[in-house]
Amino acid sequence: MITKEAAQKIAKLARLKFEEDTVEKFFTQLSTIMDMIDILNEIDCKDIEPLTSVCNMNARMREDAVTSSDLSSELFDNVSGNSTQLAKEVKYFITPKVVE
């Protein structure tokens, strides 16, 4: 069981601000969550294998094939404006300054 003072400290640490009428609701909800966690902690699961996925399916594997993937010329064909040629040469997108 969690105390009301501990709930208020947790809210302060999380930088949560509550109106006076909602503090009691927060306290009740947090206490319920902590009680659920206590119930889960009581479960003996040392003989249970951890799940890697909720779906018990095998992934279809394929062989890796090396291919040419330099698509920069096609990518930079979409650049418009005065910086088209420079963008193709340096292989960067040139954008207006956004941070001063």
Swiss-Prot record:
Disulfide bonds: none annotated. NCBIfam families: gatC (TIGR00135). Pfam families: GatC. Keywords: ATP-binding, Ligase, Nucleotide-binding, Protein biosynthesis. One of its GO terms (molecular function) is ATP binding. Belongs to the GatC family. This is Aspartyl/glutamyl-tRNA(Asn/Gln) amidotransferase subunit C. The lineage of its organism: Bacteria, Pseudomonadati, Pseudomonadota, Alphaproteobacteria, Rickettsiales. The keyword Zinc-finger does not apply. Allows the formation of correctly charged Asn-tRNA(Asn) or Gln-tRNA(Gln) through the transamidation of misacylated Asp-tRNA(Asn) or Glu-tRNA(Gln) in organisms which lack either or both of asparaginyl-tRNA or glutaminyl-tRNA synthetases. The reaction takes place in the presence of glutamine and ATP through an activated phospho-Asp-tRNA(Asn) or phospho-Glu-tRNA(Gln). Heterotrimer of A, B and C subunits. It is an enzyme of class 6 (ligase). The gene is gatC. It comes from the Bacteria. It catalyses: L-glutamyl-tRNA(Gln) + L-glutamine + ATP + H2O = L-glutaminyl-tRNA(Gln) + L-glutamate + ADP + phosphate + H(+); L-aspartyl-tRNA(Asn) + L-glutamine + ATP + H2O = L-asparaginyl-tRNA(Asn) + L-glutamate + ADP + phosphate + 2 H(+). Its EC number is 6.3.5.-. One of its GO terms (biological process) is regulation of translational fidelity.
